[in-house]
Regions:
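Active-site neighborhood of phospho(di)ester-bond hydrolases with catalytic His/Asp-centered motifs
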Residues: 74-80, 108-111, 139, 175-177, ...
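Short, ordered loop/turn segments at secondary-structure junctions
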Residues: 110-113, 141-143, 179, 209-210, ...
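Active-site microenvironment of metallo-dependent hydrolases
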Residues: 1-46, 51, 99-101, 286-302, ...
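Divalent metal-coordination and catalytic microenvironments
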Residues: 28, 48, 70, 81, ...
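Divalent-metal coordination cores built from histidine and acidic residues
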Residues: 2-14, 92-203, 508-512
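Histidine/acidic residue-rich metal-binding segments in metalloenzymes
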Residues: 156-176, 182-248, 254-275, 284-300, ...
Length: 603
């Protein structure tokens, strides 16, 4: 008899009173996700399984009895869509944080790792997390790269790669299908990817940003069944009506009041409503929390606590096809969290597989890294750079005038045009403009760096560099001063990746991320401190204007699958037409001026 079968046999016996429970939780108020009730009950556990939920005080026979002292007992919380890489922590360090907050299961799309390492990146995600008490369900990334032909990452995934990954038992579905254009226009690659998911019988996650009407219907018809890219209350309502599972995310909190208001107008809060974090940086994960922070925001905006908990438990379990999770019921896995209040959720105790693993925000036993798994390093395949590499030039023009296309806007980008002066072969940056610069870092091509004018970020005072840039994770630098841009970039090349700020010839802040150029091997608290310091000091380089021109937007400046212009390692791209666009509209040579500024991009 298998160990699982033996546990179930023992659970049946214990439920009938023929043998004692391993653990009996008494004096609990059960938050019943099936009925919406809060009711007094005790919970008997055998091994990793709930054996019985029965009237309070009706059973006392157990090897161990624990009183929850009237606390509210909920199923463990579940995150239906997350990129662990956004925490910049390896899986065991990430798990140590979220487990203490009551999150016991996550659906991880490791497409950041996959865009650097290919299938090996997904294998690392599986191998590095399979031993953890956190239930980690890995998805097979569909966006490697997110927009083929417009960017080059460290690998290319199509049907064959998806079939390989979907054949692994730890892989539970197809990760967010970001190439909406390819799906809607019958791309052979995207048809292969989605069909591999359909053939596997596993989940197919969506990324339906901006889709509505006929295009949204077509996207669903292709086989996609969820979306976390909600942009408004109307968008959330339309996607629910269309039949998508919506994943309300915590990474865009400014949208939550309107989305909550829309949900409150509905006659029924469907099982199609779940929650996810998507991306949470390390300092916010530690200080505010992951899913728990989102749930508290939804409660603060007026949704009933039991409904909010249902989003993160039963609804999530239904979405993720996990019939062993999501309810406090006999036969389900004993992943449980205890709250002392339903007004503001704070995990007092967390049980995983029937074992107490965290109390009052502290893990009882630290988690070790997976034995025999070597984190991938040395992934920035770049030689040191010079300031000359960061000068914008117009070929063949030493002195003259040019009209250039440029990127306008921080989060929602639009095309712009501007006339610039050229002196001594260098474009003179117009007032209010900065530069964005991208270089391929995966060793798959040796193209020269790409550089473009950037409006809407103000005049950056120095440089910001990152090797964590959605979704191809090439080396990206923003700035106006070529010397500072080179300094920040070289800091990352030397450290194996991460983020850096430079100003007036000095490094203001640097967070090293030597694992795949996106994960740190620092203790979580130290990483959070360094990341917070870098974010705080970034205001010396940039003038932030929430909600769009914010520090987090740095990571998305090259996301070519989104509408509008973006710069990638292949050039200036258009998300709508799926074309690489020449930034040069027109230029002409003019006589050299007698006097001019000789340091336009290094000031």
């Amino acid at each position: 008899m298998s160990s699982n079968a033996e546990v179930r046999r023992r659970a049946v016996q214990a439920a009938r009173g023929e043998s004692p429970f391993d653990l009996l939780l008494v004096d609990a108020q059960i938050v019943d996700m099936a009925t919406g009730e809060i009711r007094d009950a005790d919970v008997g556990i055998v091994g990793e399984m709930i054996a019985s939920v029965h009237p309070r005080g009706s059973r006392t026979d157990a090897h161990e009895v624990r009183s929850l002292q009237g606390g509210y007992l909920s199923p463990g919380l579940m995150d239906t869509h997350v990129h662990l890489e956004s925490s910049h922590l390896p899986p065991e360090r990430y798990a140590e944080i979220v487990l203490t907050q009551g999150t016991t299961a996550v659906f991880w799309d490791p497409h950041e790792l996959a865009n650097v390492l290919g299938v090996d990146g997904v294998r690392y995600a599986v191998d590095a997390s399979r031993h953890l008490p956190l239930q980690v369900m890995v998805a097979a990334p569909s966006s490697v790269p997110s927009t083929p032909g417009l960017e080059m990452s460290g690998a290319d995934f199509a049907g064959a790669e998806m079939e390989t990954m979907l054949g692994w038992p730890e892989v539970r579905g197809v990760a967010e299908v970001m190439d909406m254009h390819g799906v809607l226009n019958g791309s052979e690659r995207m048809q292969e990817i989605v069909q591999a998911g359909l053939n596997s019988g596993k989940l197919i996650e969506g990324h339906a940003r901006g889709l509505s009407g006929a295009d949204l219907q077509a996207y669903l018809a292709a086989g996609v069944t969820s979306d976390h890219e909600l942009t408004s209350a109307a968008d959330a309502r339309e996607k629910l009506r269309a039949g998508l599972t919506i994943e309300i995310r915590g990474s865009h909190p400014y949208l939550l009041p309107d989305i909550v208001a829309a949900l409150k107008t509905l006659p029924h809060l469907s099982s199609q409503i779940t929650v996810c974090t998507d991306d949470v940086p390390p300092d916010m994960l530690l200080e505010k929390g992951g899913i728990i922070a989102l749930l508290n925001l939804l409660i603060a905006h007026g949704l009933p606590t039991v409904d909010v908990l249902r989003f993160a438990t039963l609804n999530a379990a239904i979405r993720l096809q996990r019939n062993d999770l999501g309810l406090i019921a006999a036969g389900r896995r004993a992943d449980l969290v205890v709250f002392d209040s339903l007004e503001k959720l704070e995990a007092q105790e967390v049980y995983v597989g029937g074992k107490l693993i965290a109390r009052n925000g502290h893990l009882l036993t630290p988690l070790a890294a997976a034995p025999g798994v070597t984190p991938p390093r040395d992934t920035l395949q770049l030689a040191p750079l010079d300031a000359e590499d960061f000068i914008l030039r117009i070929k063949g023009i030493r002195h003259g005038v040019a009209r250039l296309r440029h990127i306008s806007g921080a989060r929602f980008t639009k095309w712009g045009e501007v006339e610039v002066q050229i002196r001594d072969g260098e474009v003179q940056l117009p007032a209010g403009f900065s530069l964005i610069w991208v270089k391929h870092r995966h060793g798959r091509h040796q193209a020269t760096p790409q550089i473009a004018l950037l409006e809407g970020w103000g005049e950056l005072r120095g440089a910001i560099a990152t090797s964590y840039s959605h979704d191809s994770h090439n080396l990206v630098v923003l700035g106006r001063a070529a010397n500072d841009m080179a300094l920040a970039a070289n800091q990352l090349i030397a450290s194996g990746g991460g983020m850096a700020l430079a100003q007036q010839g000095e490094i203001l802040a640097h967070v090293a991320m030597p694992i795949a150029g996106m994960l740190s091997d620092l203790p979580a608290a130290e990483l959070a401190r360094q990341f917070r310091e870098l974010r705080d000091l970034s205001s010396k380089v940039a003038d932030w204007e929430p909600p769009y021109r914010v520090f987090k937007a740095i990571e998305g400046t090259c996301l070519a699958c989104n509408a509008g212009p973006h710069l990638t390692d292949l050039g200036l791209t258009d998300g709508g037409s799926r074309q690489i666009v020449d930034p040069l509209i027109a230029c002409r040579e003019t006589p050299a001026p007698t006097h001019h500024n000789n340091n336009p991009q290094g000031a």
